[in-house]
Amino acid sequence: MRKHIDIVFSRLSGPILNPPPDNNVIPKTDRKLRITEVILRFAVVIFALVSAIMVGTASGTRDLGGGIRIHAHFTLLKTLPFLVIVDGILAVYSLLQGLRCFLSLYMRHILLNKALAWTIFCCDQALAYVIFAAAASTAETAYISEQGLDELQWIKVCMFFRAYCFKSGAGMINAFLAALCMVFVSGMSVFHLFRLYGEKRAYGHIAEQVVISEEAAERRNSLNGI
C-alpha cells in the first residue's frame, strides 16, 4: 500500500499539485467573472457614496410667518442616520474588496485562501442584509412622511419640505441599487469559497483513480506471472 501512495504522489507532483511556472495566467472564463466582480464592487462604492451624500446633505427650511421658521435635516427621520452609517461602512469595505479583486486580475491567487474566503463570504452576506434592511426601513419612513399617519398623528412632512424629501428619496434609491449589487456580489463570494473545496475534492478523486489503476495493473502482472 505504501508503494501505491508513493506512486500517487510521484504522479501528482507534476502537472496536478505543482502549478506550471506561468501560474499567473488566468483562464478566460475566470477572468470575465473577476472583471464582473470588480465592476460590481466599485458600483457598490458609487451607489453607497451617492446615497450617503444625498441623505446626509438633505435639509430644508419652511417659513411659517411671524418670524417662525422650521428646519429639517437628515436626523429628523431616525432611520436616515442609520442609513448614512451603513452606506459609509459599505463604501469603505467595497472599495477595499474592489482593489483586491482588481489586483487578482493580474495575480491569480493574491490574497485568497480559505480563511479569507470565509471572512469575505460572511462580510458580504452580512452587509447585503444590513444595507437592504436600512434601505427598506428608510422606504417605510419615507412613505409615512409622504402620506402621513393619522393614527400616530404623523403629519405629511414632505408637504413642507419637498427638496428635503426629494434628496432623501434619491439617496434611498441608490441604497437599494447598492443592495442589489451586493446580492450578486454575495453569490460570487459563495462561488469563490466553495470552489476552493471543489478543487480539493478533485485532487482526491484523481488520487483515488490512480490508486485503483495501479492496483489493477499489479493484479494483471501477477496473473501474467502465474
Swiss-Prot record:
Belongs to the Casparian strip membrane proteins (CASP) family. GO terms for cellular component: plasma membrane. This is CASP-like protein 2BC1. Keywords: Cell membrane, Membrane, Transmembrane, Transmembrane helix. InterPro entries: CASP/CASPL, CASP_dom. Coiled coil: none annotated. Homodimer and heterodimers. It is found in: Cell membrane. Residues 1-37, 100-114, 192-226 are cytoplasmic. It comes from Picea sitchensis. The keyword Membrane applies. Residues 59-78, 136-170 are extracellular.
